[in-house]
């Protein structure tokens, strides 16, 4: 278990540190995505700066960064030690947010968090995801949808716990990710309250 834990956490962090938005922006426009638009290295800013095609690629790749370490950890431990996939997934998110290859300046970890919790807590993540998507469709605020997903996933998991008996390690992880997401989106929350947050489809002011 210790070897699997170390291996998957290391794998998760190193994979999470691969900033696909940075790499794709450099490849297409030879720019640092962190110096453009909102300055965030993620799919939403990629959409603003590069368009829908590159943004979809970044979104899918960032989600995959969360799925891969969690699945690998489950496979290596036969699902017997839920702490291992939880920490491997967390490591991937920390890698995305603070990537070792790019000066520890990354994104907010939303897509990678989706990959992790969708792997470990599929139904709660699905329910939270539906609410998040609807909020984005009706309000055009991606940050609001991201926050709703982060907060509602652990709530949904707790509601479903008597029926699905999710490992508590997964619940704790979801709560921790919600707190991390709130902190990473603190400036967005300020703009949402002030009514100055950027809407989907509009260029960053």
Swiss-Prot record:
Q: What class of enzyme is it?
A: transferase
Q: What EC number is given for this enzyme?
A: 2.3.1.275
Identify the metabolic or biological route this protein is part of: Lipid metabolism; phospholipid metabolism
SMART domains reported in the protein's UniProt record: G3P_acyltransf
| Keyword DNA-binding found | no
Q: Which UniProt keywords apply?
A: Cell membrane, Lipid biosynthesis, Lipid metabolism, Membrane, Phospholipid biosynthesis, Phospholipid metabolism, Transferase, Transmembrane, Transmembrane helix
- Which processes are annotated in GO (biological process)? phospholipid biosynthetic process
An example molecular function term from Gene Ontology annotations: acyl-phosphate glycerol-3-phosphate acyltransferase activity
Question: Which is one Gene Ontology cellular component term of this protein?
Answer: plasma membrane
Where is the signal peptide, in residue numbers? none
| Primary residence | membrane
Where does the sequence pass through the membrane? 5-25, 56-76, 84-104, 114-134, 144-164, 165-185
List the catalysed reactions.
Answer: an acyl phosphate + sn-glycerol 3-phosphate = a 1-acyl-sn-glycero-3-phosphate + phosphate
Q: Please indicate if the UniProt record lists Ribonucleoprotein as a keyword.
A: no
Q: Where in the cell is it found?
A: Cell membrane
Membrane-related topology note: Multi-pass membrane protein
Q: What does the subunit comment say?
A: Probably interacts with PlsX.
Entry similarity comment: Belongs to the PlsY family.
Write out the function statement from the record. Answer: Catalyzes the transfer of an acyl group from acyl-phosphate (acyl-PO(4)) to glycerol-3-phosphate (G3P) to form lysophosphatidic acid (LPA). This enzyme utilizes acyl-phosphate as fatty acyl donor, but not acyl-CoA or acyl-ACP.
Enumerate the NCBIfam families for this protein. Answer: glycerol-3-phosphate 1-O-acyltransferase PlsY
Q: What is this protein called?
A: Glycerol-3-phosphate acyltransferase
| Organism encoding this protein | Shouchella clausii (strain KSM-K16) (Alkalihalobacillus clausii)
Taxonomic lineage is: Bacteria, Bacillati, Bacillota, Bacilli, Bacillales
Gene (name only) = plsY
